[in-house]
């Protein structure tokens, strides 16, 4: 069975055969990473949809669950999710509607609002996380522990390089 990446790889090989200065391996690796990320997101979104939630709501629940008291201010949630405060309010509204969080006044300052994960929210996470973890184990079982360590090291190295390029104002050219 051909990989879903085969058509892209064939196109790149064709381009490389016509242009001797074509940076085949660099473009191939970049496209492989992009293709894999797309497939990972597609798979994850299908799983989350089957569980009745989307990525944004799920990440908000995980963010709350990861806090010491399972509580966070809306502005902190906004920052953690990389979204606007308006969008964080919409997210909190949906989580509250589903009974997964409660809005509570701060013990120290009544003007300060906290989003608190409810028992129903904890219960939902206890339900949805095991199938997700199982799926991840299935995916990553294709690699040995050594290969996973190597991939992590290489990925971190490339991410550091991207961060440095961004700091230096270097923009990746459009993919050929």
Curated annotation (Swiss-Prot):
- Stored Pfam families: MarR (PF01047)
List keywords of the entry alphabetically.
DNA-binding, Repressor, Transcription, Transcription regulation
**Superkingdom assignment:** Bacteria
A molecular function (GO) held by this record is: DNA binding
Q: Kindly give the PROSITE patterns that the UniProt entry links to this protein.
A: HTH_MARR_1, HTH_MARR_2
Q: Which Gene3D superfamilies match?
A: Winged helix-like DNA-binding domain superfamily/Winged helix DNA-binding domain (1.10.10.10)
This protein's GO cellular component annotations are: cytosol
- Upregulating conditions: Autoregulated.
Alphabetical GO biological process terms: DNA-templated transcription; negative regulation of DNA-templated transcription; regulation of DNA-templated transcription; response to antibiotic; response to stress
- Where the record annotates domain HTH marR-type, the positions are 26-160
- Asked whether the keyword Lyase is assigned, the reply is no
Which NCBIfam families does the record associate with it? Answer: PRK10870.1
What this chain does, per the entry, is described as: Negative regulator of the multidrug operon emrAB.
What protein name does the entry list?
Answer: Transcriptional repressor MprA
Instruction: Specify the taxonomic lineage.
Output: Bacteria, Pseudomonadati, Pseudomonadota, Gammaproteobacteria, Enterobacterales
